[in-house]
A protein has these predicted regions:
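Carbohydrate-interacting/catalytic domains
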Residues: 2-11, 16-139
Length: 139
């Protein structure tokens, strides 16, 4: 959702991956919990907080908030079980399949919701993972 054009809204707790069932009902308890988790996660590479912050940085750098959006089909390396869309210079690939998606070797990954592994020098996008790519490296 952070790649979509328009205003960005996060509910309190989303930035630390806090589920609704884990949220305390008292607002001050929730604020304390978010502050505590944010402090811990800020220095952890790949943590929800670090990922949201990096996504916000890339969103600002590429000016995605006011960019046009286009759905993309026909990429040879992108199976039909994936959702792909282009926002300005960022190609977003959402792997909704049960298998990893192999990206082109020259793909420049800007952000990924899960760690990517490599196979023969090519990044693999695991199932249930969203990856942002610099569009000029994968067209």
């Amino acid at each position: 959702m952070l790649a979509l054009p328009g205003s960005l809204y996060l509910r309190q707790g989303d930035e630390i991956a806090l589920s609704d069932s884990d949220k305390p009902t008292a607002p001050l308890e929730l604020a304390d919990m978010v502050a505590e988790h944010t402090q811990v996660q800020s220095s952890q590479f790949g943590s929800p907080t670090a990922t949201v912050r990096h996504a916000a940085h890339v969103r600002h750098e590429y000016n995605l908030a006011c960019a046009p959006l286009a759905f993309v089909t026909g990429l040879e390396w992108c199976p039909p079980q994936t959702l792909s869309f282009l926002v300005r210079g960022v190609l977003v690939v959402v792997n909704t399949s049960d298998s990893p998606v192999t990206l082109p070797a020259e793909a420049k990954v800007l952000l990924s919701s899960q760690p990517l592994r490599q196979e023969e020098g090519r990044p693999l996008v695991p199932p249930a993972t969203t990856t942002w790519l610099e569009a000029t490296t994968v067209a």
